[in-house]
Amino acid sequence: METKEEKKERRQGYFARLKKKRQAKQNTETVSANSPGSPVSKTPAEKDDESKVILEQISSSGDNCKFAGEKETVPEKEKRKKKYNQLKDIRRTELKRYYSTDDNQNKTNEKKEKKMVSQKPHGTIEYTAGNQDTINSIALKFNITPNKLVELNKLFTHTIVPGQILFVPETSVARLPSFSPGAPISPSSSDAEYDKLPDADLARKAFKPVERVLSSTSEEDEPVVVKFLKMNCRYFTDGKGVVGGVMIVTPNNIMFDPHKSDPLVIENGCEEYGLICPMEEVVSIALYNDISHMKIKDALPSDIPKDLCPLYRPGEWEDLSSEKDINPFSKFKSLSKEKRQQNGDSPNVPGAKQINPSDKEKSADFEVLQSSESTGSIKSKSLEFYNNITATEHLEKFAADPHVKEPSEEKNVSDIRTKEDSLSGGGDDFIDLEKVPSPMDRGLDRKISLMEGLLADPRELGRTKQQVTKPTTEVQEHFTVDSLEKKDSVEPKADLDLELCEKQDVIPEVNKCVSSPTGKVETALDTKKELEKDKLIEFYLNKDGSGSQSSEDLHKAEIQKGENNKAIGIDLTLSCSKSQADEVHTVKSMELDSCCVGRKAASLESSAAAAEEKDLKESLDSSLVPAVDKTCQETQLDNQSEVRLWLLQKIQVPIEDMLPSKEEKSKTPPMFLCIKVGKPMRKSFVSQSTTVSQQYSKKIKQPEYWFAVPREIITVEEAKRRKSVCSYYGEEDDDDALPVLKHHSALLENMHIEQLARRLPARVQGYPWRLAYSTLEHGTSLKTLYRKSASLDSPVLLVIKDMDNQIFGAYATHPFRFSDHYYGTGETFLYTFSPNFKVFKWSGENTYFINGDMTSLELGGGGGRFGLWLDADLYHGRSNSCSTFNNDILSKKEDFIIQDVEVWTFE
């Protein structure tokens, strides 16, 4: 029995040891589980279930114990209680661990989600990079810069890998569908509406290139602020005309696009005139008031000698729009290429060139003006015209006489004709000639009818004969040239002479004092120009020689009266007394009336002219030959000296008189912009290869490009401000309105303010004037002036009054300050009211505008002289003529003593 009991105890000891080990193991786990958090509280139902399970286990273990041992002792009960408690604790720890692990996982997931949400920027969506995607392509697709995309995704490099998730702006994705795989893009409201359409599926299957589509609610519908200049201008090409267009200046390029409506663009195409130039190639840019610095072909009209025009200001530069006056020289009526060929290569057919009716009247007016300057009355004008006709007709008859002509004369006269034609620029006339089959001179019948009553009065003929001084001089000139043309049959030269006669502005008088050699030279020069006038008459009569002779008897009685006075032609041709202005206008109206009559009866006029031509040749046969023989040797001069005298006389005429247009100069002429570049500008409408081959071949010097630009360029904000001001004042003319002065001025009166306000730049007009410094309030110190001007950020107006009570000063684009060098812009100017108001603007020679230091304030300089100089105490001042403004002395004396100083700003 004892052995069996010992075995039982041994078995219990074994299980007891196992339980102890298990219990110790569980205790360590409970300690570790209890440490992170408090025990989990449980409901009473859960506690009952757990206790039931534990009791069942205990009962089963108790049965085993009973089976093992028959009687239970007291220590065994205590052990059972301990086991029960231990099992209960184990169960609690397992449940606690279960619930605690779930909570920890949820918390970590929540933290990850919160972290993901915080990393995603607001207003962005995820985009998965594809195989062909780069940072630049993605940025371009979503309208964002690459640097902004890198900053948005907090990337360290610009390198991405396929499948990488990036954040992109959501607004761009709503407008642009992504084509990369795996991009989690949710359809926007616009896409949802698009899906409701019946053909949405078909539309989505259609291939569409990737492009930007601006929605109505997009932020990019708002105008983007880009700094650029856009202005209408004219481009002076080098030998290809002057073209109007638009110049666009950006921070990177300078571009010029010609107007498609420009005549030269229509004729030659836009390829010749479109320009583009990078800013890196620009060497210098300068603005000039005139085009005297221009050294290209199209600086002046082609018919004016370039060396005779050091300064030329074109008139009527009203605006630079594409619709009005595109060509700046459009007022000069230049011939086209076809008309120039007609003038140069006209056929040798009599009557081939005529003047059209509108230009006929102009030539008639010109002809009457010529005759009016050489006669004393309306009657003498008519007689001169009539006798010129008789003289030239008889000279044609004498042209066949071989004893009178000399070969040297023919050569000399032909040289004179060719040189004069080359100097006169016959290729570019301002009166257009056309081939119109006109029968004869329109005003001939009217002139003959006027002379019918004049020839009957012998007293008038006696007066005109007394005016003759050297009759044979001009007759010899008529004879030599007429005989030369009769021999060589040079009809096109008559056409050119007609154009030359119509172009002449100055009709000389015959010099009556011909005793000295200079007098002879002047006489020859005058008779040479009178010859041009007679050539005009001869041209009309020669081309009508084939007219009908049916009306010869109608004018026979009138011509017989002319035969009784054979020397009248010579007498009246050289009459040179000045006429009055009212007589000129009277004859003009008569000539215009004769033109109208001539159009109605062309056939009658032609027959009358033919009859008159025949009889007048017979009337002066015997009277002209002796006079021609006597003075043939006296009138021959050196050809070179004659041409030189003619050229000198042309040079002495003012340049304004040489121009066809004598209009009043424009009040706002343009500025001339000169752009010097390192390489020639590329043509924007020509392919790259041809552009390089055409333009980069000449690298002799830096190319220059000239443009006529507006004098005033304003910003869009300034244009809006002006528009608002105009709308505020309505239709009232506010040009005379005085600006608002916030403070009272001790120096400026209303007259001064009004005149100054008109000359101020546009960007300060309309702003009120505020007094920034005054010697009466702040004392006489230049340092105080600097201190008061330090806080200003706008142009200032300096007003000075000296001890002579003279008011003058300057407008400065920048407030006065200490500086180591000159500053300011070309808007700076000097002005004076001594004695009259004058403004001296920038001359363009240098940029010495404003300079301030501790000892003085200087405005304008050059050559050691200052336009305006003030000392540190604002007591002494000096004014000299400087090259910056080309100004006069502003005060009465160069050195002056300052009485008061005011500085006004515009705010």
Curated annotation (Swiss-Prot):
Any idea where this protein resides? Nucleus
Q: Where is this region: Disordered?
A: 1-51, 63-83, 99-121, 335-373, 401-443
Query: Bias category Polar residues: which stretches?
Result: 25-41
Q: Which InterPro entries match?
A: LysM_dom, LysM_dom_sf, TLDc_dom
Cite the TLDc domain residue spans from the record.
746-907
Keyword Transcription among UniProt keywords: yes
What GO terms in the biological process aspect are recorded for it?
regulation of transcription by RNA polymerase II; response to oxidative stress
The residue ranges of the LysM domain are 125-168
Q: Which PROSITE patterns match?
A: LYSM (PS51782), TLDC (PS51886)
Q: Which Pfam families match?
A: LysM, TLD
Biased composition regions of type Basic and acidic residues, renumbered to the chain: 1-12, 68-78, 99-116, 401-422
Do you know which Gene3D superfamilies this protein is assigned to? LysM domain (3.10.350.10)
Coiled coil residues, start to end: 1-29
Q: Which GO terms describe its molecular function?
A: transcription coactivator activity
This protein's GO cellular component annotations are: nucleus
Q: To which protein family does this belong?
A: Belongs to the OXR1 family.
What is the official name of this protein in its record? Nuclear receptor coactivator 7
UniProt source species: Gallus gallus
